[in-house]
């Protein structure tokens, strides 16, 4: 697919990421301006790279014409909280918004991955206004604590270092460290 076509596909997702970041940053600001504790510590986002989209489509056997329906995380938002209790508070804030609709949830807090990875992933529908009118897009929102984010970064780096074939002794040490962290 040519570069210009990819730009036109990804442009609305870039808009969605920018708008969502602004909305979540506004939640932080509103809480702080009113001397309230904000359940959101920080927010970031990204649009998945073309190579990552193509790799995922190949791995999951997704045809090009189904890309926007089946690759749910082209737009990604990460919300970092201080405490685990804040995660459900943030999920409720999202649930109660009129500009976002939750499509699905993957709860890696209740169903911790074998590696020890923990997070709450929400797939939402979000509408952006484009030159051609409104576009309803999907975005993935990952909600986790600072400790969980640190953990996910280390785990991802190790998976990358070992090219997805992490030695059992490293995986075991990683899992044991997460068990210890979870009890702190």
Question: Residue ranges of each PLM-predicted region?
Answer:
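Short amphipathic alpha-helical segments
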Residues: 73-77
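Long beta-strand-rich cores associated with HINT superfamily self-processing modules
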Residues: 68, 81-181
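Charge-rich, low-complexity segments
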Residues: 1-72
